[in-house]
Amino acid sequence: MKRIAVLTSGGDAPGMNAAIRAVVRQAISEGMEVFGIYDGYAGMVAGEIHPLDAASVGDIISRGGTFLHSARYPEFAQLEGQLKGIEQLKKHGIEGVVVIGGDGSYHGAMRLTEHGFPAIGLPGTIDNDIVGTDFTIGFDTAVTTAMDAIDKIRDTSSSHRRTFVIEVMGRNAGDIALWAGIATGADEIIIPEAGFKMEDIVASIKAGYECGKKHNIIVLAEGVMSAAEFGQKLKEAGDISDLRVTELGHIQRGGSPTPRDRVLASRMGAHAVKLLKEGIGGVAVGIRNEKMVENPILGTAEEGALFSLTAEGKIVVNNPHEADIELSSLNKSLS
């Protein structure tokens, strides 16, 4: 394989630029030409495919977002869109593609492989909801950003003896909420993978204030409900008068990636190029126990249960991290 391309698709994530940089420089070191596909699958169909060299990716390892830009393009799920994209790949002599994104992006990579273009998927999403990898590119930065914000909110919460409901991203996965909540000593962590009773939360809040607590921090995963809705239900369930809600929003998707995300993205990008050089396609790169692994995209792109609840009341984290966390610890003070 002499000529490959790289694209980013779906929601952006810190560390995508580091992955692109690794793909480009590893490919050059292997004697391959590299092209960047701008604006994801939409750019592929439009022919926005341009050569990249080592200088093209200089000084981007520390930048958030993706300099190739990203776009959602549902039309690529249809055969017509796929054939248009493949026509452009052939026109530019592309023999393999590295796709950086989430599960929707993986479906596109799977279709390319089925049409004879080996594609490698790299897990680029802050949600950490990709099966087959302990961590995704961008997750660590998103958790760090959320942690910093929650720490600041705790300061003002303590000043006024307030209860704060802080909504974090994650789509249908509770990983950001779980990690950021534990890291900040949140009083409650509400995630889609575990049930909760509003009356228990009300009782916990009141008991805390009676014991002299100066604040109450509730970290809420967006996959459960919005902070506004949760706050309203909390007020209806009990007399919680001094309550504020905050949605951290897209701040979690931006910013300079953490060292962990930069290194993870670099390792994954280089590994993807090595696979393409061997003619391997249709797989997604992951990290398990700090080692690079490959999984069939077909299984990786399909949504799987990240958590399961045992009869003993424990959350077993099937993916992305190996751990048992008692359900009770999520519904009582961790501070």
UniProtKB/Swiss-Prot annotation:
Residues given in the record as ATP binding sites: G11, R72, Y73, G102, D103, G104, S105
Pfam families assigned to the protein according to its UniProt record, in alphabetical order: PFK (PF00365)
Annotated Mg(2+) binding sites: D103
S-S bonds: none
Entry cofactors: Mg(2+)
GO-annotated cellular components: 6-phosphofructokinase complex
Chemical reaction(s) catalysed: beta-D-fructose 6-phosphate + ATP = beta-D-fructose 1,6-bisphosphate + ADP + H(+)
Annotated compartments: Cytoplasm
Record pathway: Carbohydrate degradation; glycolysis; D-glyceraldehyde 3-phosphate and glycerone phosphate from D-glucose: step 3/4
Family statement: Belongs to the phosphofructokinase type A (PFKA) family. ATP-dependent PFK group I subfamily. Prokaryotic clade 'B1' sub-subfamily.
Protein name: ATP-dependent 6-phosphofructokinase
Taxon lineage: Bacteria, Bacillati, Bacillota, Bacilli, Lactobacillales
